[in-house]
Every structure is written in C-alpha cells, then in structure tokens.
Amino acid sequence: MPNIKSAIKRVDVAERNRQRNIAYKSMIKTFTKKFMTRLGEYAQSPSEAVLTEVQALLNQTFSRIDKAIKAGVIHTNTGARKKSRLDAALRTALAKAQAKAG
C-alpha cells in the first residue's frame, strides 16, 4: 500500500480505469456473442427479417468497438481486426445462404 499521496491517487486512478476497461471489453464480447448467435440462426434458416436484425447487431457491435478504441481501451488495429472478422463471418454466412437458396 503506497504511503505517498500522489501514489495513492495513482492507485485509485488505475483501479477506476481498470473497471472502465473491463466494462468496455465485456460490452464488446456481449455484442459479438449476440451477433454470432443471430448469424448462426440466419445461416440455419435464411430470412429477410433475421438478416435485417443481424445487420443491425453488426452495426451496434461496430459502434461499441469504435467507442472502445476512442476511449483507449483497445488498440486501433485490434478493433479493426475484430471488425474485419465479424464482417468476414457475415459475408461467409450470406454466401452460404445464397448457395442454399440458389
């Protein structure tokens, strides 16, 4: 436990930032899981309603990732990689749905 006042403040700031980082990362994971779940449902039975919901979830997930980047919680390249992988998953599911339909 630090004795110097500035060191005590640094500990408080570090804890506050750690809690904020946990919240942002958890939010990204939650929205990613929601997106992937709905995407799996779309892959099983493609429909316009589910596709619209999947695209809305993708936009929300991208927004959360961008907010985490802006807050400095994740690195820019990490955010870009996550977004790219989500987009690739959507494109793969759309291609499979078209192959199934056609």
UniProtKB/Swiss-Prot annotation:
Organism in which the protein naturally occurs: Gloeobacter violaceus (strain ATCC 29082 / PCC 7421)
Function, as annotated: Binds directly to 16S ribosomal RNA.
Gene Ontology biological process: translation
NCBIfam families recorded: S20
Stored PANTHER family: 30S RIBOSOMAL PROTEIN S20, SMALL RIBOSOMAL SUBUNIT PROTEIN BS20C
Gene label: rpsT
Gene3D superfamilies the record matches: Ribosomal protein S20
Record lineage: Bacteria, Bacillati, Cyanobacteriota, Cyanophyceae, Gloeobacterales
Source domain of life: Bacteria
Protein family: Belongs to the bacterial ribosomal protein bS20 family.
GO cellular component terms attached to this protein's record: cytosol; small ribosomal subunit
Pfam families according to UniProt: Ribosomal_S20p
HAMAP family named in the record: Ribosomal_bS20
Protein name: Small ribosomal subunit protein bS20
Family annotation (InterPro entries): Ribosomal_bS20, Ribosomal_bS20_sf
Entry keyword set: Ribonucleoprotein, Ribosomal protein, RNA-binding, rRNA-binding
GO molecular function terms attached to this record: small ribosomal subunit rRNA binding; structural constituent of ribosome
